[in-house]
Each structure stands twice: as structure tokens, then as C-alpha cells.
Amino acid sequence: MVSFTTLLTAVATAVSAVTASPLEALKRGIQPGTGVHDGYFYSFWTDGRGYVDFNNGPRGSYRVSWSNVNNWVGGKGWNPGPPRRIAYNGTWNNWNVNSYLALYGWTTNPLVEYYIVEAYGSYNPSSGAARLGTIEDDGGVYDIYRTRRINQPSIIGTASFDQYWSVRRQKRVGGTIDTGKHFDEWRRQGNLQLGAWNYMIMATEGYQSSGSAEIEVRSLD
């Protein structure tokens, strides 16, 4: 039997939810960090400027909104993240702001940050980089790039490291990615070496922008 005290508590909770301020609502998302939720690894990082409300959903899904950020990135996937075929879908309507939707991950020894970019907004992440080759995957063409980061945040702290990129010419929000194909072509066409597998997530990233996304990822292997 439900007690009167329990009913009062439920009513108070409901009223509190309705009357919560926007700032309080922002606090309901998870804190920056990494972990496992419903069988999937997640990572959420922010440099602390602006607001990011990141929420894990069932299985490989998450939803996020951000406002006036400097830089943040987060998503769900696997750790470790060896080569695999993945499928993803969702909503990402950040075409007019600086944001990426990408399969994102890291390796160590060597320390490498990599992106397989499916969609981007107002800024092309390959701007200013030399193209090393192309990859065909799931009916689209990706251009391969390498950039270098000096004394920047990484999974081992502040460090210098290479970034490897596959940037899809035909932007999209939904499809499949054969990560092994990208990794092989990075080595073959650009002599881009990867190390020990760290995490791999289907990520949303925002830079000096506001936006939102709802994404789900799953493995096909």
C-alpha cells in the first residue's frame, strides 16, 4: 500500500520538476567524465565555459544541448575501440554553427586523436590541412588529412599529438561506418600509424557555439 507520506513526496517532486529554473535543469545532466551506461562506454569533456546538458539514454543513445560554450565533446561507444563496423542515426541540426558529428577516438603509443566526420556546420575541420588521399565508404567519399596539436588536452593530460581525419564530402546524419577500412587507408595512403586502442565513440562536438543533438550508435560486428 502506498503511504500518505509517499504520496506527498511524489507530489512535491512533481511540483519541483515543473518549477525548476533553467539553471537547475542544466544541472540534471551527467558530470564531465567517462563511464559505462547500459552496456556502452561514454565520454563527456568540456573546458568549463558555457553550459552543456549531456544525458545518457538507453543502449548507445544520448541527447545533448549546449549554450555559449567554448569547446566540448561527448558521446557513447566502446572502450577499448578496435576496428568495427558501426551504424548510427539521430538528429543533429547544427549546420549553421561550429559543430561536428563524428566517429571519434584515441590511441596511445603513439598518442593519436582521430575523427571520421559525418557532418559539420559552419567550419570545415580540414581547413588549411593538406589532403593525403580519399576513402569510399557506405556510398560516400571521405578526404584524409593529418593535423598536429601542440600542448593541448588529451586522454593522458596536456600533450602534443597528431590528429587523423576522414571528412565525408556528402554530409549526413545516419548510416554505417567501417572503421577498419578508414584505419587501413590512413596507413596505406598517408603512412598514418595508430597505437593501442583506447575509446571510440559516436560524438558530437561544439566549439564557440550553441546547439543540440540526439544520437544513437550500435555495433554491426
UniProtKB/Swiss-Prot annotation:
- Activity control mechanisms: Retains an activity of 52.5% in the presence of 5 mM SDS.
Query: What name does this protein carry?
Result: Endo-1,4-beta-xylanase 11A
Which family does this protein fall into?
Belongs to the glycosyl hydrolase 11 (cellulase G) family.
Q: What is reported on how temperature governs activity?
A: Optimum temperature is 60 degrees Celsius.
Return the PANTHER family for the record.
ENDO-1,4-BETA-XYLANASE A-RELATED (PTHR46828:SF2)
Name where it mostly resides: secreted
Q: Cite a single GO MF annotation.
A: endo-1,4-beta-xylanase activity
The record ties this protein, via InterPro entries, to: ConA-like_dom_sf, GH11/12, GH11_AS_1, GH11_AS_2, GH11_dom, Glyco_hydro_11
Q: Which residues bear sugar attachments? A: 89
Under catalytic activity, the entry for this protein gives: Endohydrolysis of (1->4)-beta-D-xylosidic linkages in xylans
Q: Which UniProt keywords apply?
A: Carbohydrate metabolism, Glycoprotein, Glycosidase, Hydrolase, Polysaccharide degradation, Secreted, Signal, Xylan degradation
Xref: SUPFAM superfamilies: Concanavalin A-like lectins/glucanases
For the protein in the UniProt heading, the enzyme class is hydrolase
- Source species of the chain: Humicola insolens (Soft-rot fungus)
- Which processes are annotated in GO (biological process)? xylan catabolic process
Pathway it acts in? Glycan degradation; xylan degradation
